């Protein structure tokens, strides 16, 4: 009877020491929602926003009677949401032991990160009016893969951080009068700019902060 009781206690102690899905979820949430927001305030590349340098482009006119070549001057772009919009999708995978290290894998969602642009245009109509308008580009339907690993008794580190194909939706001020063809080309320039800059940020400054955040949160081991 004593042997059975000791065995039961041993199994209970073992079970309580094994990390669960809940532990993995709590770890990921602490990294994303507690540590990243705290660390990001000391990262000038990301706080209070990431900056997109000025750029210019033109959109050809389509009808000499109604519009001219559209000249676009973007004086500033600001990307926000790195501290608030990155979230896990559902549950993380149960922590497992891989090559002597505990591994935590989660799918992340980047929807909601957005860029706003200070934009000056000329030529959307036949009189070539000068207009100061807003443009907003939002990340939609974009996920990524994350894995952190740690040896027992040591800090965790980022093993995998991969952002899947980034999707962006662009909207602009209704004060800008463009037909569908010109509107598509106009918005494409902003989409292309965001798709160029975001990966540089994700795999640069953000990944650096992610690593610091992971190493500062107690790691749940199996």
Swiss-Prot record:
Sites carrying sugar chains: 56, 73, 109, 114
Superkingdom of the source species: Eukaryota
Induction: Up-regulated following blood feeding.
Tissue localization of expression: Salivary gland (at protein level). Adult midgut.
Annotated transmembrane regions: none
Chief location: secreted
Name this polypeptide is given: Salivary anticoagulant protein P23
């Amino acid at each position: 009877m004593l042997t059975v009781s000791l065995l039961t206690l041993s199994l209970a102690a073992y079970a309580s020491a094994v990390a669960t899905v809940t532990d993995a979820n709590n770890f990921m949430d602490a990294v994303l929602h507690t540590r990243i927001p705290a660390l990001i305030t000391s990262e000038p590349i990301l706080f209070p926003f990431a900056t997109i340098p000025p750029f210019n482009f033109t959109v050809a006119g389509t009808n000499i009677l109604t519009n001219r070549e559209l000249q676009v001057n973007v004086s500033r772009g600001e990307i926000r949401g790195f501290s608030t919009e990155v979230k896990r999708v559902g549950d993380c995978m149960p922590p497992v032991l891989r090559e002597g290290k505990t591994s935590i894998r989660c799918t992340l969602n980047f929807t909601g990160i957005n860029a706003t642009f200070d934009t000056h245009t000329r030529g959307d109509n036949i009189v070539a009016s000068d207009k100061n308008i807003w443009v907003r580009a939002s990340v939609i339907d974009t996920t990524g893969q994350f894995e952190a690993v740690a040896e027992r008794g040591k800090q965790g580190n980022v093993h995998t951080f991969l952002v899947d194909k980034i999707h962006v939706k662009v909207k602009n001020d209704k004060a800008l009068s463009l037909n569908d063809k010109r509107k598509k080309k106009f918005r494409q320039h902003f989409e292309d700019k965001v798709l160029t800059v975001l990966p540089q940020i994700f795999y640069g400054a953000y990944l650096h902060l992610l690593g610091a955040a992971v190493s500062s949160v107690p790691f749940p081991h199996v």
